[in-house]
Design a protein with these regions (language model features):
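Regulatory N- and C-terminal appendages and interdomain linkers associated
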Residues: 2-5, 18-84, 100, 309-346
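Conserved ATP-binding subdomain of kinase catalytic cores across diverse folds
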Residues: 69-184, 207
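Extracytoplasmic/secreted envelope proteins and their assembly/folding machinery
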Residues: 95, 117, 121, 198-201, ...
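Conserved kinase catalytic-core segment
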Residues: 114-117, 122, 177-256
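Bacterial N-terminal signal peptides
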Residues: 10-20
């Protein structure tokens, strides 16, 4: 009997060692090793040389977050007077670079994306995702404006403007964008609940514009922001443009930005069901499969711990702070709550 017990103990020890080796083989690989095994046709983005990649951080008590000030808070809102630096001719919308009274540099945007970008980024921020501090400025004046191209339509000769989005240029950050930006289907965070939660958040606000490093000709909407943290560097995966939100997802000729009627009309199509353990979404965008695929019910349940705690008052004040009219605020508030309810029911 003593020999039998000894043999069982030896077998159990061997089994544990085998399991440990298997786990190491599955999960202990570096991102470089995983990259070598990936198909050669698609470049694998790795940030291990620059620092640990991260896409999400616990937002804390979601119910108390200020949707007026957002990430930057009310105290960091752009302060006039604004001084012209130069016109930014990149992207599809008119933009100007300015400096405010506090010496902070801002990217000022006009056009169809202004309201959507401010509000959608508030939702992403409340869910724990990294965004850039942005504010809606109803009117103002930029001193020293000259030689405007696209922005001439939105800025008078005396520098006065209306309905602009101000996005802060944070100091001390290295931004890896364009050719160094990340790809939705090829990065070290694919398959994690945090990364899948980002995809759900994109669909929740109906952001069809999930362009990435594959779309350099049209401009990537992803980037890696390197933040110094002590003696190390934290590499944050960021969606840099939320302007294609709060409207209709779909093809080139059907999608819209900041269109509550279209946003509400697509509410019944938000979630189609569940197949093979994965949620089937109605959403479509620039990269539909990469944006909607591989999301489980447990991923959605995890995200609801944060998204589900955003209250109606926060939504309303956030919409108002984004420049929404009272009618738009009522419409968007109801539609967004209905979408969150669909997730909770499923």
């Amino acid at each position: 009997m003593r020999q039998t017990i000894l043999m069982k103990a030896m077998f159990a020890t061997a089994l544990l060692l085998m399991l440990g080796m298997t786990r190491t083989a599955l999960y202990g690989q570096s991102s470089e090793e995983r990259a070598k095994k990936a198909p050669a046709k698609t470049k694998v983005i790795s940030t291990t040389q620059s620092g640990m990649p991260i896409v999400w951080r616990d937002p804390g008590t979601v119910e108390t977050l200020d949707f007026v000030g957002g990430l930057g808070g009310r105290e960091q809102a752009p302060k006039p007077p604004f001084t012209f630096i130069e016109e930014d001719r990149t992207g599809s919308n008119p933009k100007i670079k300015v400096m405010d009274a506090n010496g902070v540099k801002w990217s000022v945007k006009w056009g169809s994306e202004v309201n959507a970008e401010v509000f959608a980024s508030r939702i992403a921020w409340a869910a724990g995702y990294f965004v850039e501090p942005s504010y809606f400025v109803a009117s103002g004046k930029i001193d020293g404006v000259k030689k405007l191209g696209r922005a001439k339509k939105y800025v008078n000769s005396d520098g006065n403007f209306t309905d602009a989005r101000f996005e802060m240029n944070e100091k001390g950050i290295t931004k890896l964008d364009d050719k160094q930006s990340w790809q939705w289907d090829r990065n070290s965070l694919v398959g994690t609940r945090e990364f899948n939660g980002l995809k759900i958040t994109m669909m929740l606000v109906s952001n069809f514009d999930n362009k990435d490093v594959r779309d350099l000709g049209r401009g990537s909407n992803t980037a890696i922001f390197q933040y110094p943290v002590g003696d190390t560097v934290e590499s944050r995966y960021v969606v840099t443009d939320w302007g294609g939100s709060m409207g209709k997802w779909g093809g080139v000729f059907s999608r819209e930005k900041w269109d509550c009627k279209g946003y509400a009309q697509q509410t019944p199509e938000f979630i189609k069901g569940v197949k093979g353990g994965f949620v089937v979404w109605g959403w479509s965008g620039q990269h539909t499969k990469d944006g909607a695929g591989g999301i489980s019910g447990s991923d959605m349940k995890w995200l609801l711990q944060y998204i589900g705690r955003i209250n109606d008052d926060q939504i309303r004040v956030g919409l108002k702070a984004s420049g929404a009219t009272q009618e738009e605020s009522q419409c968007f508030s109801k539609a967004l709550r209905d979408l969150i309810l669909q997730m909770q029911i499923l």
